[in-house]
């Protein structure tokens, strides 16, 4: 048994010696290992280069995006708003003023249907932060709505809009805010914004560069989902309307804007209080432009950016009952 173990050990030793000698011989042989090593080194170099490029990109300041024109370079939008005393007047004017505050380079011409300015409107304008001109003119009694008459029987806001046009033409009359009219050569656009409508601020971007008279659809008006111009090949070819489609300009007051230089060049252009029902807009526009020269806006008049909304008249039954009992709401609190 001892002999066999000795023989096994000897054989293991000889085999190990032979393996060691073979390994030593192989170490001395030429090895073709350089190409793989060079390839690996090149990959590492490329990765290092890419990392350096990414680090440089992170340190580089971002490109400056194209900037819109500075407010001073924009034509001024003159927004003319007639208003009259009623329970919802302040609520309407607050909503409108906060929409207008989002629009750069805007001048608000707010015209009260009153003999003189009221504290409510004066205070609201002062707090609005807007550039404004405060005007006031009373609607003649013959033109006023009578008790129980629907609003569409007589045109409203005629005297007030014309008062604002007079101010733009240098005839004065301001009772608050900016007193001086725009100097000759001023580039701007005039828009008639009633205090009860709803306006997207995008609308003002659309009208700002008006050259003559620009137009667009108005939502929720004339018994339709919208009224507005029909456009073909970039030109107005008709009007989508249901009531008296043969009017010279079947447009809503909120559906157009006029370049200021055009208005100033036509001193007789104004609204006619005696115009037939529904023709108030036409009474002004007929002095200014031919229908074929209207400038379609709002994606060729396919977008609605203004809505002819109406605030519901508040029901004051409980207030009246408390007033009869001498317990009405505090009149010193402005609503």
UniProtKB/Swiss-Prot annotation:
Name used for this protein in its record: Galactosylgalactosylxylosylprotein 3-beta-glucuronosyltransferase 3
Required co-factors: Mn(2+)
Pathway, per record: Protein modification; protein glycosylation
Site (Interaction with galactose moiety of substrate glycoprotein): 227, 318
Keyword Glycoprotein listed: yes
Source organism: Mus musculus (Mouse)
Function: Glycosaminoglycans biosynthesis. Involved in forming the linkage tetrasaccharide present in heparan sulfate and chondroitin sulfate. Transfers a glucuronic acid moiety from the uridine diphosphate-glucuronic acid (UDP-GlcUA) to the common linkage region trisaccharide Gal-beta-1,3-Gal-beta-1,4-Xyl covalently bound to a Ser residue at the glycosaminylglycan attachment site of proteoglycans. Can also play a role in the biosynthesis of l2/HNK-1 carbohydrate epitope on glycoproteins.
InterPro entries per the UniProt record, alphabetical: Glyco_trans_43 (IPR005027), Nucleotide-diphossugar_trans (IPR029044)
Top EC class, one word: transferase
Residue intervals annotated with topology Cytoplasmic: 1-7
The enzyme's E.C. designation: 2.4.1.135
Coiled coil: none
Assembly behavior: Homodimer; disulfide-linked. Interacts with PXYLP1; the interaction increases the 2-phosphoxylose phosphatase activity of PXYLP1 during completion of linkage region formation in a B3GAT3-mediated manner.
Main subcellular location: Golgi
Ranges that cross the membrane: 8-28
Keywords (A to Z) from UniProt: Disulfide bond, Glycoprotein, Golgi apparatus, Manganese, Membrane, Metal-binding, Signal-anchor, Transferase, Transmembrane, Transmembrane helix
Residues in the Lumenal compartment per record: 29-335
């Amino acid at each position: 048994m001892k002999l066999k173990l000795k023989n096994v050990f000897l054989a293991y030793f000889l085999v190990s010696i032979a393996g060691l000698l073979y390994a030593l011989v192989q170490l001395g042989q030429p090895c073709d290992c350089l190409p793989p090593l060079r390839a690996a080194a090149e990959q590492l170099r490329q990765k290092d280069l890419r990392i350096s490029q990414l680090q440089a990109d992170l340190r580089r300041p971002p490109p400056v995006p194209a900037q819109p024109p500075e407010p001073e370079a924009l034509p001024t939008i003159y927004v003319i708003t007639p208003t009259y005393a009623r329970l919802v007047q302040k609520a309407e004017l607050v909503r409108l003023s906060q929409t207008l505050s989002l629009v750069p380079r805007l001048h608000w011409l707010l015209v009260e249907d009153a003999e003189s300015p009221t504290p409510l409107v004066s205070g609201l304008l002062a707090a609005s932060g807007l550039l404004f001109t405060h005007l006031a003119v009373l609607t003649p009694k013959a033109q006023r709505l009578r008790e129980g008459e629907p609003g569409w029987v007589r045109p409203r806001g005629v005297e007030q809009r014309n008062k604002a046009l007079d101010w733009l033409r240098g005839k004065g009359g301001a009772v608050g805010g900016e007193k001086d009219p725009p100097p000759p050569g001023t580039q701007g656009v005039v828009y008639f914004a009633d205090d009860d409508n709803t306006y997207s601020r995008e609308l003002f971007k659309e009208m700002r560069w008006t050259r003559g008279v620009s137009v667009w659809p108005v939502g929720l008006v004339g018994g339709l989902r919208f009224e507005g111009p029909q456009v073909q090949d970039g030109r107005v070819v008709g009007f989508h309307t249901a009531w008296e489609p043969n009017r010279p300009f079947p447009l809503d007051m909120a559906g157009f804007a006029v370049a200021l230089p055009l208005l100033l060049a036509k001193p007789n252009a104004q609204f006619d209080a005696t115009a037939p029902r529904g023709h108030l807009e036409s009474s002004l526009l007929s002095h200014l432009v031919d229908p074929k020269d209207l400038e379609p806006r709002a994606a060729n008049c396919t977008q609605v950016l203004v809505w002819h909304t109406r605030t519901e008249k508040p029901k004051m039954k409980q207030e009246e009952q408390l007033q009869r009992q001498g317990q009405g709401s505090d009149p010193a609190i402005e609503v």
